[in-house]
C-alpha cells in the first residue's frame, strides 16, 4: 500500500466543491457495559451534550448507527458469497463537515476538553475503537421512495 504525502492527501484528484468530509468512528462499548446502557448514554447523554458544540464549529450532520445483537442477527438473511463477514462494532458514528480545520478547532475548545473527552471514557472502549475519514459521494433520487 502506498503512503500519500500531506500535499497529495489535501489535494484529491477530484473537485471537493460542495462536498463533505465524513469522519466515521467504528466504536466499541466500554467492557462490561450492556448494549442498552451504551446506546442510552450515546443517545440521551452524549448527543445532547455534543450537538450545540458541533453546530458551533460547522458540523453539518451527525449520525449514530447502533449495531445491537438483535439487528446484527438480521445480517444472516443478507449474507451471500461476496458479503459474508460481519463487523463486530457496537456503533458507527459519522460526523459530516466541510473543513477538517473546523473539527480540529472543536477539539481544542475548552468545553470539549472539559466535558466530552471525559465522557468518551464513560461509555466507549477508546483503545479498540477505530476511525477513518473520507469525502462523501451522494446519489440523490431517494427522497420520494418512502
Swiss-Prot record:
Q: Where is the EthD domain?
A: 31-126
Family assignment?
Belongs to the tpcK family.
The protein's job, in short, is: Decarboxylase; part of the gene cluster that mediates the biosynthesis of the dimeric xanthones cryptosporioptides. The pathway begins with the synthesis of atrochrysone thioester by the polyketide synthase dmx-nrPKS. The atrochrysone carboxyl ACP thioesterase dmxR1 then breaks the thioester bond and releases the atrochrysone carboxylic acid from dmx-nrPKS. Atrochrysone carboxylic acid is decarboxylated by the decarboxylase dmxR15, and oxidized by the anthrone oxygenase dmxR16 to yield emodin. Emodin is then reduced to emodin hydroquinone by the oxidoreductase dmxR7.
Q: Which InterPro entries match?
A: Dimeric_a/b-barrel, EthD_dom
User: Which Pfam families is this protein grouped with?
Assistant: EthD
Name the keywords, alphabetized: Lyase
| Record field: catalytic activity | atrochrysone carboxylate + H(+) = atrochrysone + CO2
Q: What sections of the protein cross the membrane?
A: none
E.C. number(s) listed in UniProt? 4.1.1.-
List the pathway annotation: Secondary metabolite biosynthesis
Tell me which domain of life the UniProt entry assigns to the organism this sequence originates from. Answer: Eukaryota
Gene Ontology molecular function terms on file: lyase activity; oxidoreductase activity
Q: What is this protein called?
A: Decarboxylase dmxR15
Amino acid at each position: 500500500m502506498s503512503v500519500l504525502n500531506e500535499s497529495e492527501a489535501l489535494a484529491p484528484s477530484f473537485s471537493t466543491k460542495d462536498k463533505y468530509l465524513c469522519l466515521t468512528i467504528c466504536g466499541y462499548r466500554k467492557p462490561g457495559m450492556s448494549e442498552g446502557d451504551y446506546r442510552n448514554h450515546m443517545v440521551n447523554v452524549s448527543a445532547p451534550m455534543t450537538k450545540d458544540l458541533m453546530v458551533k464549529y460547522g458540523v453539518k450532520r451527525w449520525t449514530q448507527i447502533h449495531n445491537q445483537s438483535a439487528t446484527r442477527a438480521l445480517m444472516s438473511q443478507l449474507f451471500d458469497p461476496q458479503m459474508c463477514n460481519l463487523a463486530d462494532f457496537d456503533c458507527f458514528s459519522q460526523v459530516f463537515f466541510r473543513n477538517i480545520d473546523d473539527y480540529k478547532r472543536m477539539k481544542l475548545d475548552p468545553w470539549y476538553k472539559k466535558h466530552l473527552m471525559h465522557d468518551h471514557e464513560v461509555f466507549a472502549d477508546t483503545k479498540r475503537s477505530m476511525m477513518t475519514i473520507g469525502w462523501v459521494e451522494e446519489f440523490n433520487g431517494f427522497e420520494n421512495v418512502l
